[in-house]
Amino acid sequence: DISTAREFQLRVMYHFNREVMRRSTTQFVCEGLEMLQPAVPYLFVSNHRDIVLDASLLQNALVDAGHETCEITFGANLMTHPTVVDIGKSNKMFRVERGGNKRQFYESELHLSRYIRHAVVDRGSSVWIAQRNGRTKDGLDRTEPALVKMFALSGTGNKLTSLAQLNIVPVAVSYEYESCDLLKAREMAQAAHKPYVKQPGEDINSIITGISQPKGRVHFRVTKPLGAAQLAPLAHLPLNDAVRHVALMIDHAIIDAYQLMPTNMAAYALLHPEE
């Protein structure tokens, strides 16, 4: 019998992820977890390429390295199918609301910020969140400054101190072949001419495609936490400027840690034939 989310993760999802790796990858490597302390909670901020696997495969790596699994943010737009909702709730996922008017948006951001801080600081539970709203479709991984500002919303006193309390850890994920590349390219091509309207069932199709299709080599690299020492030089800046600098620090960490694949080299050669 399974009675807790942790048991579900260890007895079901861990083996499910192993089977996904066996069937659809040629290699999975996660580096950097040795720099983290198993007893310390972290806020993992990751570039986002796959709806489910970016966070789910990290869970396996955490277990293998002797860490506790983390809670996972999941967009409300994905919590529409009953099966997805059930699996999400059983897998330490929590719903992130998007949209609404300015007041509703602010209240949602404040609620999310408070929950993340409560999870990390008060309960000692690590959390995973993507660096931006939605997956990267053009290969340009950029952290939204608004995300960092959201982290700081729930802090009291010095905002940089409140950010340091979250133990932000940038994570770089890299797939040799992105399972949803054709779907992403089609969406980008259509969006170039008119606003893209997502069709019913499209997110579920992307989840299934991402899990089932070949990925080749998969590489994750966990980087050093952004602690008080790293954030201290920003103390003299206004909040908005400090937030932008923190977002850039996350970007630089992810880009430096990103494992380039032959597909990246081929794409660059096509874009820059003169070099």
Question: Can you say where each PLM-predicted feature lies in the sequence?
Answer:
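Short, flexible loop/turn elements at secondary-structure junctions
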Residues: 34, 46-50, 76-78, 97-100, ...
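Glycine-rich, often proline-containing surface loops adjacent to acidic residues and nearby aromatics
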Residues: 37-41, 89-96, 125-132, 221
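Membrane-anchoring hydrophobic helices of lipid-metabolizing enzymes
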Residues: 1-42, 48-59, 63, 85, ...
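A short alpha->loop->secondary-structure connector
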Residues: 62-72
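Short helix/loop capping segments that flank catalytic or ligand/cofactor-binding pockets
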Residues: 52-55, 82-83, 138-139, 179
